[in-house]
Amino acid sequence: MAKRDYYEILGVSKSATPEEIKAAFRKLAKEHHPDRNKSADDTLFKEINEAYEVLSDSKKRAQYDQFGHDGPQGFSSASGFSGFSGGFGGVDFDINDIFGSFFNNASSSHNSSNQYETYDIHLRLHLDFMEAVNGISKNINYDRKITCHKCQGTGAKDPKDVKICTKCHGRGTSIENVHSLFGTIQQEVECHECEGTGKVASSKCEQCYGKKVINERVNLTVEIPAGTREGEKLLVSKKGNIVNNQEFDLYLHISVKPSKYFALDGLDIYSETYIDPIKAIVGGIIEVVTINGIKTIEIPSNTPEGKKFRISGSGIVNKKSNIFGKKNGDFYTTIRYAKPVELSKDEIAYLKNISTRTNQNVEYYKNKVLKEISK
């Protein structure tokens, strides 16, 4: 049976941020977990965990986006395994499902940093081409979670109503039996009753309704440095969610709107410059519009259309130049012939006189064609 698409299983788009994927997983995991839903489908619950295990890991997600279920799923060379399916009575499985899910989940229950990663906020920021090139101060608005001031993050109406979780006995984790090809294996996971805190509240705070956090609208000005490029991730420290009085980070994922007139290749910029054909013949100084304004360059006489010229150091700012000593990118422009301006009778007569001269390049090409048709 063909495996379902991981994005479809979690109900998210292929462009979903890590935060959106985490939120979708938590919602589905609670809804379909056997401890909370006695009629839960074990197969669906396994699919949900499998999908999240891949999509929550940037390397595995990239490989899945490229290869799908048939390709590698992000195993490191140290693991000694490569993804495979079949071979045991027609049962499809991935070796990572058997080993990785146990050890990864077990370790995450003891490693609070995995939990805290979910409190970072990821936003997509759209920039115009020149905003990215020159840098800009950008105002952004977004929602974040902060610790409820009324209950101080307990979720309870009264601090006395906060009790030790009876399911995990305050550990924040519980043991589950997982059935595999190798038998039943015990797996330590986050307690679903107290969500890993080890405590539950018998009453609900009147402000946060037991959620322990409240929403806050943030208006923030961020500085986008010159030379910011498509696909970059900018860190804004301590501007994410605030949970248990700990400030988490905001990540801005950059999208740059393409320019109509400039093309990027690394730090280099490419453009086209239109000149009068007469100027191309006689040569001289021409003006080139760059991202830094107008620059002048000198072209030789008889400059052909398509000739490329370079203006050194006039490309994208290299933000790492102070560290590695690398120069900025270069600016390249390709010559294009503009439609000639209207000429006077005397100018036309002068050009007609010149045009009667034999051009060896024209004759050479004509003779090549004649040779072809005379075969």
From Swiss-Prot:
CDD domains: DnaJ, DnaJ_C, DnaJ_zf. One of its GO terms (molecular function) is unfolded protein binding. Keywords: Chaperone, Cytoplasm, DNA replication, Metal-binding, Repeat, Stress response, Zinc, Zinc-finger. Transmembrane segments: none annotated. Residues 5-68 form the J domain. The keyword Magnesium does not apply. Its cofactor is Zn(2+). Binds 2 Zn(2+) ions per monomer. SUPFAM superfamilies: Chaperone J-domain, DnaJ/Hsp40 cysteine-rich domain, HSP40/DnaJ peptide-binding domain. A zinc finger (CR-type) spans 135-217. One of its GO terms (cellular component) is cytoplasm. SMART domains: DnaJ (SM00271). InterPro entries: DnaJ (IPR012724), DnaJ_C (IPR002939), DnaJ_domain (IPR001623), DnaJ_domain_CS (IPR018253), HSP40/DnaJ_pept-bd (IPR008971), HSP_DnaJ_Cys-rich_dom (IPR001305), HSP_DnaJ_Cys-rich_dom_sf (IPR036410), J_dom_sf (IPR036869). Zn(2+) 2 binds at C165, C168, C191, C194. Zn(2+) 1 binds at C148, C151, C205, C208. It is found in: Cytoplasm. PROSITE patterns: DNAJ_1, DNAJ_2, ZF_CR. GO terms for biological process: chaperone cofactor-dependent protein refolding; DNA replication; protein refolding; response to heat. The J domain is necessary and sufficient to stimulate DnaK ATPase activity. Zinc center 1 plays an important role in the autonomous, DnaK-independent chaperone activity of DnaJ. Zinc center 2 is essential for interaction with DnaK and for DnaJ activity. Participates actively in the response to hyperosmotic and heat shock by preventing the aggregation of stress-denatured proteins and by disaggregating proteins, also in an autonomous, DnaK-independent fashion. Unfolded proteins bind initially to DnaJ; upon interaction with the DnaJ-bound protein, DnaK hydrolyzes its bound ATP, resulting in the formation of a stable complex. GrpE releases ADP from DnaK; ATP binding to DnaK triggers the release of the substrate protein, thus completing the reaction cycle. Belongs to the DnaJ family. Homodimer. This is Chaperone protein DnaJ. It comes from Ureaplasma parvum serovar 3 (strain ATCC 700970).
